[in-house]
C-alpha cells in the first residue's frame, strides 16, 4: 500500500562512501535530506580493503577535505596505521595512506549522519524513481513509503542486482552478505537509462591467531604521522603493523591445477572486472613469468582478530581457496573467517551524465560512485560530494561546481568518466592527470578551499585557518626572495660541507634553496630571521621553491588550454547542421553534449580536424548574431 511519507529537497539512495558525502554536503548546505540504506549497520562500509588513500587516492581524499567533505576527518579519527607512499619520488606522487579500523570508521560516519540537523537517515529499500516530464518527483520504497523530492542522488554501490560468485556457487546478494537491491534496476531501465554489468572481488579474511608472522616482513607505520585533514595539525597514535609475504610455487601450482574451476575462465562471470586490481588467479595466468606475487596482511581494526589478505582476491571454489591461502608462507595454518568472492552488479555508462553528475535527460537525477562505473572508496566519495553540492546549487538556482582537469584530481576523475566513458571499473591514478605537479596532495587546500567556502561547506573558523596558512606561505616565500646571502667565509664553508659550490656574488635565499643538494630545511642555520611555521607550511614552501620552474611550465600549459576550456558550446547547437564534421564526430558530440571546446576535444572519435570545423562554425554563428 503506497502512502505519502514526507517531502525532502534531496533524497540520497545508498549510504556508502558516495552516499555519505552526498548527504552531508546537501544537509550542510541547507537542504532537507533523506538518505536511504539497505542496512543501518553497513554505512560507509569498507566491503573490501580496510584502508583509505594510497597513490592518487590520497590526493582525492585531500581534495574532498579541502572542499569541506568528511572522509579525511573520519579516517584521521579512526586510523590504526599511517604511511606516506612514494617518498623516494617527486612531490607530485607523494600519497598518504591510512589503515582503518573499519568498524569504527563506519560507526563514526553513521553517528555523524544521525546528528546532522538536516539529515533523516532511514533503513529503506528504494524500488522506484518517479519521473514526470523528464523531471524527478519522488521515490517509492519496498514498504510503500513515497517521498517527494527535488533531487535524487543514486549511490547504489555494488547492491544493484548484486550477485556473489564463489566457484560454481552463485547467488543473489549485496557485498559482505548483505541484501541486494533487485527491484530498482528495472525502474531505471524504464526511464531509458542504459545499464551494464561490472564485477569486483575481495580476498578472504583470516584469523590472526592462525598466522605465523615470523615468516613475514613487518611493515610498521611512519614515525611522523601526517593527517589527511587540513583541520588537524598533528596526530599521535599507537599504530598496528601490517605484514608482507609472497605467493609460493605451490600457490601457483594449486591455481593452475584448478583454473578450469575459476568462474573467470569458465564463463560464469559476465561482468567486466577492474584492470588494476585483478584476482590472484588472473595475475598468475596473465603474468606467467613472475614466480611470486606480493601479499599484504592487514589488520581490520583494534578490537578484532580479522585480517585482510591483500593481493589475493579470488572467486575460486572454497575448497581450492583453503589450499591456496595455506600455501603462502606464514599462512600454513590459516583459519578462513570469510571466504573470498567476486560480485557482479548493475551500473551505468557515465556518458549519460554531464559534468555536474546529473543525467542529461532527467532533471534532478544524479549518479555517484560505483553506480557511475568507478571503483574505490575515494573515487566514490569524491563523486558523492560533487553530486551533493551540485544538486543543492541547482535547487538554489545557482551556477554548478565543475572542477577542471587543471583544478583537481576530482576534475580529472569526473571528466574522464563523463567525456571518455569507461569499459571497466575506473580507478584514479596519478598518470591520468596532465598537470599532476600542480595537483599535489600538499596544496589541495590552496586549490580548493576557497571553492568549498563559496558553496557553503567550509565554515568560517576553518576558512580563517586556511587564510592564515595561505598568508604564512606567501609571506615566507616573499621574505626568502628578498633575503640576500653573501659569500662570507662561514657561509661558503657551510655550502662546501653540504656538497654545494661557493658563492661568488650575493644570491637570495630563495634561489639558494633551489640548488639540488639544498632545501628549505637544510639552510635553516643561515636564516636567523626564520618565523615559526607548521610542518606542512614548511613543506609547502620547500616544494614551491624547489619545483618553481616545472610548476611555471605547467601553469603555462594550463593557460594555453584555458582558451578551449573557456570556449562554451551553446546548448542549442545542432551538430547535424555543421558541414565538414565527420559522422562519428557528430554521433559522439550528440551523445556526450560537451559544455566547452576543451571537453569536446577529449572525446574519443572527435579529431583535431573536427574541432577546427566546430570552431569555425561557432565563429560564423557569433558574427551572424
Curated annotation (Swiss-Prot):
An example molecular function term from Gene Ontology annotations: flavin adenine dinucleotide binding
Cross-referenced SMART domains: GIDA_assoc_3
Location, primary (coarse class): cytoplasm
Superkingdom as given in the UniProt entry: Bacteria
Pfam families: GIDA (PF01134), GIDA_C_1st (PF21680), SAM_GIDA_C (PF13932)
Keywords, ordered alphabetically: Cytoplasm, FAD, Flavoprotein, NAD, tRNA processing
GO CC terms: cytosol
Cofactor: FAD
SUPFAM superfamilies registered for this protein in UniProt: FAD/NAD(P)-binding domain (SSF51905)
InterPro entries according to UniProt: FAD/NAD-bd_sf, GIDA_C_N, MnmG, MnmG-rel, MnmG-rel_CS, MnmG_C, MnmG_C_subdom, MnmG_C_subdom_sf
Functional description taken from the UniProt entry: NAD-binding protein involved in the addition of a carboxymethylaminomethyl (cmnm) group at the wobble position (U34) of certain tRNAs, forming tRNA-cmnm(5)s(2)U34.
Subunit text: Homodimer. Heterotetramer of two MnmE and two MnmG subunits.
Protein's recorded name: tRNA uridine 5-carboxymethylaminomethyl modification enzyme MnmG
Organism this protein belongs to: Clostridium botulinum (strain Hall / ATCC 3502 / NCTC 13319 / Type A)
Gene: mnmG
Amino acid at each position: 500500500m503506497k502512502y505519502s511519507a514526507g517531502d525532502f529537497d534531496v533524497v540520497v539512495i545508498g549510504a556508502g562512501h558516495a552516499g555519505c558525502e552526498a548527504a552531508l554536503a546537501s544537509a550542510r548546505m541547507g537542504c532537507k535530506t533523506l538518505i536511504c540504506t539497505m542496512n543501518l549497520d553497513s554505512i560507509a562500509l569498507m566491503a573490501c580493503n580496510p584502508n583509505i588513500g594510497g597513490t592518487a587516492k590520497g590526493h582525492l581524499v585531500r581534495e574532498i577535505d579541502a572542499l569541506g567533505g568528511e572522509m579525511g576527518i573520519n579516517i584521521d579519527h579512526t586510523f590504526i596505521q599511517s604511511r606516506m607512499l612514494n617518498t623516494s619520488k617527486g612531490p607530485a606522487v607523494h600519497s598518504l595512506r591510512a589503515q582503518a579500523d573499519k568498524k569504527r570508521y563506519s560507526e563514526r560516519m553513521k553517528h555523524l549522519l544521525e546528528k546532522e540537523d538536516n539529515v533523516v537517515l532511514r533503513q529503506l529499500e528504494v524500488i522506484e524513481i518517479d519521473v514526470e516530464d523528464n523531471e524527478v518527483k519522488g521515490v517509492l520504497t519496498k514498504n510503500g513509503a513515497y517521498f517527494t523530492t527535488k533531487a535524487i542522488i543514486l549511490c547504489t554501490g555494488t547492491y544493484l542486482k548484486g550477485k556473489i560468485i564463489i566457484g560454481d556457487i552463485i547467488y543473489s546478494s549485496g557485498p559482505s552478505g548483505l541484501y541486494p537491491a533487485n527491484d530498482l534496476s528495472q525502474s531505471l531501465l524504464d526511464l531509458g537509462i542504459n545499464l551494464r554489468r561490472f564485477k569486483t572481488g575481495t580476498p578472504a579474511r583470516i584469523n590472526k591467531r592462525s598466522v605465523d608472522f615470523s615468516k613475514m616482513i613487518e611493515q610498521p607505520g611512519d614515525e611522523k604521522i601526517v593527517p589527511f585533514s587540513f583541520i588537524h595539525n598533528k596526530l599521535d597514535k599507537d599504530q598496528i603493523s601490517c605484514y608482507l609475504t609472497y605467493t609460493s610455487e605451490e600457490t601457483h601450482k594449486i591455481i593452475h591445477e584448478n583454473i578450469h574451476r575459476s568462474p573467470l575462465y569458465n564463463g560464469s562471470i559476465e561482468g567486466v572486472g577492474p584492470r588494476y586490481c585483478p584476482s590472484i588467479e588472473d595475475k598468475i595466468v596473465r603474468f606467467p613469468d613472475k614466480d611470486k606475487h606480493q601479499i599484504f596482511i592487514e589488520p581490520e581494526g583494534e578490537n578484532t582478530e580479522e585480517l585482510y589478505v591483500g593481493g589475493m582476491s579470488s572467486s575460486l571454489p572454497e575448497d581450492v581457496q583453503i589450499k591456496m591461502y595455506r600455501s603462502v608462507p606464514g599462512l600454513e595454518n590459516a583459519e578462513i573467517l570469510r571466504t573470498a568472492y567476486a560480485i557482479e552488479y548493475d551500473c551505468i555508462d557515465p556518458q549519460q551524465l554531464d559534468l555536474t553528475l546529473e543525467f542529461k535527460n532527467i532533471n534532478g537525477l544524479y549518479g555517484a560512485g560505483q553506480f557511475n562505473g568507478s571503483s574505490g572508496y575515494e573515487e566514490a566519495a569524491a563523486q558523492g560530494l560533487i553530486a551533493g553540492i551540485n544538486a543543492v546549487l541547482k535547487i538554489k538556482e545557482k551556477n554548478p561546481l565543475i572542477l577542471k582537469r587543471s583544478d583537481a584530481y576530482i576534475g580529472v576523475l569526473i571528466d574522464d568518466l563523463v567525456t571518455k566513458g569507461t569499459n571497466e571499473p575506473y580507478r584514479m591514478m596519478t598518470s591520468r592527470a596532465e598537470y599532476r605537479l600542480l595537483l599535489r596532495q600538499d596544496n589541495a587546500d590552496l586549490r580548493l578551499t576557497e571553492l568549498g567556502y563559496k558553496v557553503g561547506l567550509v565554515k568560517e573558523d576553518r576558512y580563517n585557518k586556511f587564510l592564515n596558512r595561505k598568508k604564512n606561505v606567501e609571506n615566507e616565500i616573499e621574505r626568502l626572495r628578498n633575503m640576500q646571502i653573501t659569500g662570507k667565509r662561514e657561509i661558503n664553508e657551510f655550502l662546501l660541507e653540504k656538497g654545494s659550490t661557493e658563492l661568488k656574488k650575493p644570491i637570495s635565499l630563495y634561489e639558494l634553496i633551489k640548488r639540488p643538494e639544498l632545501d628549505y630545511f637544510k639552510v635553516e642555520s643561515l636564516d636567523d630571521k626564520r618565523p615559526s611555521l607548521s610542518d606542512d607550511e614548511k613543506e609547502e614552501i620547500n616544494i614551491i621553491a624547489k619545483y618553481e620552474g616545472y610548476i611555471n611550465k605547467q601553469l603555462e600549459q594550463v593557460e594555453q588550454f584555458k582558451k578551449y576550456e573557456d570556449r562554451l558550446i551553446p546548448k542549442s547547437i545542432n551538430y547535424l547542421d555543421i558541414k565538414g564534421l565527420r559522422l562519428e564526430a557528430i554521433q559522439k558530440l550528440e551523445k556526450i553534449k560537451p559544455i566547452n571546446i576543451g571537453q569536446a576535444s577529449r572525446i574519443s572519435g572527435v579529431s583535431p580536424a573536427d574541432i577546427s570545423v566546430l570552431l569555425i562554425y561557432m565563429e560564423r554563428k557569433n558574427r551572424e548574431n
